[in-house]
Amino acid sequence: YRAFFNIGDDVELGVQAGTSYAMARHTMFDPYLGVLPCAGFPLGEVMVIDINEQRQLWRRPHGDFPAKVLSIGLPHNGGPLLTSTGIFFIGSLFESKLYAYDVDSGELLWQHALPAPGNATPMSYAVKDSEGNAKQFVVIAAGGDARSPLGSSADYIVAFAIE
C-alpha cells in the first residue's frame, strides 16, 4: 500500500534507509509574508524555573526581528548552556547571534554576531596554560537552513573566551 500526495517545493524529502518510510520536513511560515511562523507573539522565549520552589523566576522574549523592526522573540532550536558563574548562553534560530543572560535576573549581559544562525546548543570547555591557569571558552556551531527566509546555509564553529 502506498499513498501519494502533492507537496510544496519547500519540502525536503529523505528516505529512511532500511525501512519503508520517508521523512518530509518543511518550514511552517505564514503564507503571506513567508517569514513569520504561524503562531502568536512572542514566537520564542527563554525562562528560568526554580525547580525546588516550583516557580518561574523570569521569562522574556528571546531574539529580535531583523533590523529590530519588531521585538517579538524568535523561535530557537538549540538548548541553553548554564555556566557555574550564572551565565546563561543560548543561540537563535533566525538571528546570527549568541546571547548571554544573567540566570538570576534575566538581564541580557552580552550578544555577539555569528557568521550564520546559532541553531546549536552552546558548549563550554577550559584550557590550562603552561602555568596551570585555566581559561574557559564557550563554543557554538553556527549554520543554517537555506530554505529559511531569514537563515543561510553555512557551517562554522565559533569560540569565545570568557573573561
Predicted feature descriptions by range:
Residues 51-53, 102-105, 163:
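Short loop/turn segments that connect beta-strands within beta-propeller blades
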Residues 13-31, 36-43, 61-82, 113-124:
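Extracytoplasmic beta-rich repeat domains
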Residues 3-4, 95-96, 144-148:
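Short glycine/acidic-enriched loop and turn motifs that connect beta-strands
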Residues 57, 87-90, 137-139:
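Conserved beta-propeller blade signature
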Residues 122-163:
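Blade-level signature of beta-propeller repeat domains, shared across WD40, Kelch, NHL, RCC1
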Residues 57-58, 107-110:
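A structural motif specific to WD40 beta-propellers
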